[in-house]
C-alpha cells in the first residue's frame, strides 16, 4: 500500500491528541509529523523531536520558498508544517499523521488529494 497523509481535526478539547497517541502506540506504519515553530523550546522539548525550532528568518524563508505545507502566525510566533516532513515520512513507507485545525486540513487536502481526513466530534460541545 502506498503511504498517504492522515489528517486529524476536531474542536479544541475533543480528544484528538489522545486518540492519535493511542494509534501511534499500536501501529508502526504511521508517524506524527514534526511541525515547525519560532517559539522557544519549553523545558524538556527537543529540536527535531517535539518541534523543529526555527528562527523567524528561517521560517519566513521557508514560506517564501513554498516549503511550508500550511502555516499560521499566532501572536508573535509562527507555527506550521514543512512539506519535507510529510514527504520524508512517505518516502520511508510511513503514513504521516497531521493533527491540525479544519482550515489547515483543507489546505493539506488540496495539496494531497489522496489524504484521509478524520474529524473527531465530541459527545457534547458544552
Give the location of each predicted region.
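ATP-dependent small-molecule kinase phosphotransfer cores
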Residues: 37-98, 102-106
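Walker A/P-loop
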Residues: 17
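Post-Walker A helix-loop "phosphate-sensing" segment adjacent to the P-loop in P-loop NTPases
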Residues: 24-34
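Pre-Walker A (Motif I) flank of P-loop NTPase domains
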Residues: 1-6
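Conserved phosphate-donor/acceptor-positioning beta-strand/loop module used by diverse small-molecule
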Residues: 96-101, 111-126
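ATP-binding Walker
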Residues: 14
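The feature captures the helix immediately C-terminal to the Walker
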Residues: 20-21
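P-loop (Walker A) phosphate-binding loop of NTP-binding proteins
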Residues: 9-11
Amino acid at each position: 500500500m502506498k503511504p498517504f497523509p492522515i489528517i486529524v481535526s476536531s474542536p479544541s478539547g475533543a480528544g484528538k491528541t489522545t486518540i492519535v497517541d493511542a494509534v501511534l502506540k499500536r501501529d508502526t506504519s504511521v508517524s506524527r509529523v514534526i511541525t515547525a515553530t519560532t517559539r522557544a523550546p519549553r523545558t524538556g522539548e527537543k529540536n527535531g523531536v517535539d518541534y523543529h525550532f526555527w528562527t523567524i528568518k528561517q521560517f519566513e524563508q521557508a514560506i517564501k520558498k513554498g516549503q511550508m505545507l500550511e502555516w499560521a502566525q499566532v501572536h508573535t510566533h509562527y507555527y506550521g508544517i514543512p512539506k519535507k516532513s510529510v514527504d520524508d515520512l512517505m518516502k520511508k513507507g510511513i503514513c504521516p499523521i497531521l493533527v491540525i485545525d479544519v482550515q489547515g486540513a483543507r489546505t493539506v487536502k488540496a495539496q494531497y488529494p489522496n489524504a484521509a481526513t478524520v474529524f473527531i466530534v465530541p459527545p457534547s460541545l458544552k
